[in-house]
């Protein structure tokens, strides 16, 4: 079958993104692969986003619009997923954009290797104002640094997956092309959760057998960061990270890798990095906890069973993280308190440096 004969479904939840929406839609309509259906799901927008969706639908037969009461991106994606009729499906965000060959190139790989999932590299453009931004590159690991690598054996995929967890390939849904029948046969949908994307992707890869990676980058994730946004306090962050850690342990145990040295090291390091994030979160300007309450929270984080196990198994790669880990190992609440205040100081004074350090860890 020629690739042009294969329909691709693209699902895009939309909520109050009128400023960015036309560029996102145009990047889909300008794909070199033309056999597409685009679902724009207006999630109860209060700006002109819904009208923009309708305008595009009136001019393009491939555009389908769903208007729904505000109920979250997970609901928007799931409602469109019920209607999708393509052989493969992609999930894009409505304030990002994609390169014109993304669908064509990834579909050609899906056909060549009969893949259930194709995963590509991507860009994150972090904007500090309309003209000031940095671009960070995210590229999957492949054996021998090849541009493309296919796994048609689930055990090989699982054994190598720790390398691409490290490269952030599994967290977002939008750098991927999924075989639609694979999702529907397994009733895989986006769960109602505080983090729509990660549990969905974990469900996809749990039993997958045929996966293809490409180092080519197509997706541009736009991160808009004002000073106030970088200082936002995240409620219940620690509880969320604990739940994520349990899900990671569960997945690798299901895969039979609960004792695999490389996988355990990655999971442990990932957990400790997120404990650092939780400690730093206590020291932004929106946190209303007293000094004593913050110290109590730090003590709680450092005396958790998961922390005790992970700090022994984690092997940080960067010098600055080795220093931070050595402070954590002391379990000295006061030292960790000072450390977190310093990290927040760097974050406030040089958000670009902080963003780069956080990414390259």
Predicted regions and their residues:
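Catalytic core of nucleotide-sugar-dependent glycosyltransferases
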Residues: 216-225, 231-259, 277-307
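Short aromatic/hydrophobic "clamp" motif used to bind/position activated sugar donors
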Residues: 89
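Glycine-rich, basic loop-to-helix element that forms the pyrophosphate-binding segment
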Residues: 68-84
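Membrane-interface aromatic/basic loop that binds lipid-linked glycans or pyrophosphate carriers
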Residues: 283-361
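Donor-binding/catalytic cores of nucleotide-activated saccharide
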Residues: 94-214, 219-236
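A conserved acidic beta->alpha catalytic loop
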Residues: 27, 34, 42-51, 69-72
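N-proximal low-complexity "stem/linker" segments adjacent to membrane-targeting elements
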Residues: 1-29
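Short alpha-helix within the catalytic core of nucleotide-sugar-dependent glycosyltransferases
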Residues: 22-26, 50-54, 86, 99-111, ...
């Amino acid at each position: 079958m020629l690739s042009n004969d294969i329909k691709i479904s693209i699902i895009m939840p939309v909520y109050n993104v009128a400023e960015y929406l036309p560029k996102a839609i145009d990047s889909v309509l300008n794909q070199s692969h033309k056999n597409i259906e685009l679902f724009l799901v207006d999630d109860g927008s209060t700006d002109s986003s819904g009208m923009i969706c309708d305008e595009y639908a009136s001019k393009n037969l491939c555009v389908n619009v769903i208007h729904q009461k505000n109920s979250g991106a997970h609901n928007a994606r799931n409602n469109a997923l019920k209607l999708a009729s393509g052989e493969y499906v992609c999930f894009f965000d409505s304030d990002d954009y994609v390169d014109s060959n993304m669908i064509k190139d990834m579909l050609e790989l899906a056909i060549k290797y009969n893949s259930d999932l194709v995963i590509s590299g991507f860009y994150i453009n972090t904007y500090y104002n309309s003209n000031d931004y940095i671009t960070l590159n995210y590229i999957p690991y492949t054996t021998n640094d090849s541009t493309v690598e296919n796994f048609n054996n689930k055990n090989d995929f699982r054994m190598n997956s720790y390398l691409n967890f490290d490269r952030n390939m599994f967290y977002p849904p939008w750098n991927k092309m999924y075989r639609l029948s694979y999702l529907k046969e397994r009733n895989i949908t986006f769960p109602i959760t505080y983090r729509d994307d990660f549990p969905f992707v974990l469900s996809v890869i749990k039993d997958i057998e045929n996966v293809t990676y490409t180092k080519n980058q197509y997706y541009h994730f736009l991160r808009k960061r004002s000073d106030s946004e970088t200082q936002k306090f995240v409620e219940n962050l620690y509880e969320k990270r604990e739940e994520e850690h349990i899900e990671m342990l569960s997945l690798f145990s299901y895969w039979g890798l609960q004792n695999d040295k490389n996988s355990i090291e990655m999971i442990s390091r990932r957990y400790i990095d997120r404990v650092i994030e939780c400690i730093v979160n206590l020291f932004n300007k929106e946190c209303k906890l007293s000094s004593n309450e913050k110290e109590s929270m730090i003590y709680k984080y450092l005396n958790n069973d998961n922390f005790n196990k992970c700090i022994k198994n984690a092997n940080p790669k960067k010098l600055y993280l080795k220093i931070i880990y050595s402070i954590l190992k002391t379990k000295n609440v006061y030292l960790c308190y000072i450390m977190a205040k310093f990290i927040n100081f760097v974050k406030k004074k040089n958000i670009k440096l902080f963003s780069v350090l956080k990414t390259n860890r």
